[in-house]
């Protein structure tokens, strides 16, 4: 995994090779991590944050290929799914993870955008986040038009919706929770 992270960070390596390494080696290992021994360590998570997640924040155009973006987002989602406890102690690393996903939301490619929503939904499920961010992501998911990537949107909603009662607490016991109001308003629009 460490070598693949270094491979992805290396600008001299062709994009196809990076994508293939993630698709064939790293992501399957992370999928199996739930049923086998832990693959990710605190050092690997830190390397991922420094060499992959922070590169997007610096405006580096290293991830120009949509297939590579999807594989990186999938890898990041799997890390959050199976190794969120390794990020919990490092607030900077947590911020790097959500900023990484957030940076792909404005892109045109539907699959990349939906994979980014999936990553952010997993993040919001696992960690406390400002109410404004949770609301933006939830409403953004509800407003996405039906198209080819709808399966990813459903997965993101399946992850986020059960966490909403905890992440968006009700202010008043007599009125419906805020996230119910968001849903109603979005459906009426």
Feature-to-residue mapping (PLM):
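Flexible loop/turn segments at the boundaries of HEAT repeats in alpha-solenoid HEAT proteins
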Residues: 1, 30-46, 83-94, 124-135, ...
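Short, intrinsically disordered, charge-balanced linker/junction segments flanking boundaries
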Residues: 1, 25, 48-58, 76, ...
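Short linear interaction motifs
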Residues: 2-4, 94-101
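Alpha-helical recognition domains of nuclear gene-regulatory proteins
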Residues: 3, 7, 28, 55, ...
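C-terminal, active-site-flanking charged/polar segments
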Residues: 113, 121-126
């Amino acid at each position: 995994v460490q070598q693949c992270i270094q491979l992805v960070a290396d600008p001299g390596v062709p994009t196809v090779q990076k994508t293939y390494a993630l698709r064939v080696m790293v992501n399957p290992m992370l999928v199996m991590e739930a049923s086998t021994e832990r693959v990710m360590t605190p050092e690997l998570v830190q390397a991922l944050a420094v060499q992959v997640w922070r590169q997007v924040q610096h405006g580096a155009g290293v991830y120009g290929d949509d297939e590579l973006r999807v594989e990186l987002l999938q890898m990041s989602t799997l890390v959050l799914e199976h190794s969120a406890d390794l990020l919990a102690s490092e607030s900077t690393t947590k911020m790097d993870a959500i900023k990484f996903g957030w940076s792909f939301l404005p892109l045109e490619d539907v699959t990349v955008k939906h994979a980014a929503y999936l990553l952010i939904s997993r993040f919001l499920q696992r960690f406390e986040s400002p109410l404004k961010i949770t609301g933006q992501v939830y409403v953004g998911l509800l407003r996405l038009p039906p198209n080819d990537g709808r399966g990813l949107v459903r997965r993101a909603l399946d992850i986020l919706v059960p966490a909403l009662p905890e992440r968006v607490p009700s202010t008043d016991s007599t009125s419906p929770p805020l996230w119910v109001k968001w849903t109603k308003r979005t459906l009426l629009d």
